[in-house]
């Protein structure tokens, strides 16, 4: 249906990087956002029939894919500078390119999350899952605060503790989306499948979590 691919995409959006030049804040993303956007594009393909909002969210993955490609290319060239001194001379230019693309991506991501949540809310309401409907409202608020904060940081010099709060909020937002997408998979997708024999402890744990969530509903 697509929720599994969206879940995988959000794990790629988490910050897993290595430093190239810490003095200017240049790094390389080990799990590139480009892969996350590809997973979003593919995952939303399966969700298109259920809401126009999923269609709009999928449209937004196209410019995000372009942005992710530029960022990955710039980071890859910068990484070569660790071994090629001639490239290292242009690290600040590459960092400017990366920061510019990141700033442009912020409003795109804000609208992407809004359309994604609206689509999930519409689908959850249709299958009568009020808890997931409520989770989409929380997700919209969290992502709005986070991305508006990112825009503010890009325009106005702010104290260091604000940056630290945004880093913390990054993990809160993405883990909340992972939790919400897991709920969608278990209650919307997995609930429609035929029961299968449990072959391993992981599947057994998922079954128990599903039963607990069902009891809470």
Identify the meaning behind each predicted range.
Residues 33-66, 71-79, 112-126, 184:
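Internal transmembrane alpha-helix with an interfacial aromatic "cap," most often the third helix
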Residues 25-35, 100-111, 162-172:
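Hydrophobic alpha-helical transmembrane segments of multi-pass membrane proteins
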């Amino acid at each position: 249906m697509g929720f599994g691919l969206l879940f995988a995409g959000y794990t790629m959006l988490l910050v897993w990087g290595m430093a190239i030049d810490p003095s200017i804040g240049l790094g390389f993303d080990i799990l590139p956002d480009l892969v996350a956007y590809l997973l979003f594009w593919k995952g939303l393909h399966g969700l298109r029939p259920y809401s126009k909002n999923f269609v709009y969210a999928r449209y937004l993955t196209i410019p995000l894919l372009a942005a992710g490609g530029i960022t990955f290319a710039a980071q890859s060239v910068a990484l070569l500078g660790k071994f090629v001194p001639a490239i290292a001379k242009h690290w600040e230019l590459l960092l400017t390119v990366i920061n510019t693309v990141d700033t442009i991506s912020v409003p795109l991501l804000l609208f992407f999350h809004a359309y994604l949540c609206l689509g999930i809310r519409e689908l959850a309401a249709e299958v009568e899952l009020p808890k997931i409907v409520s989770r989409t409202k929380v997700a919209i608020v969290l992502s709005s605060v986070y991305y508006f904060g990112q825009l503010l940081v890009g325009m106005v010099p702010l104290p260091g503790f604000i940056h630290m709060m945004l880093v913390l909020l990054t993990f809160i937002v993405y883990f909340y989306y992972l939790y919400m997408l897991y709920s969608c998979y278990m209650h919307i997708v997995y609930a429609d499948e035929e029961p299968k024999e449990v072959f391993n402890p992981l599947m057994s744990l998922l079954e128990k979590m599903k039963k607990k969530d069902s009891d809470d509903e």
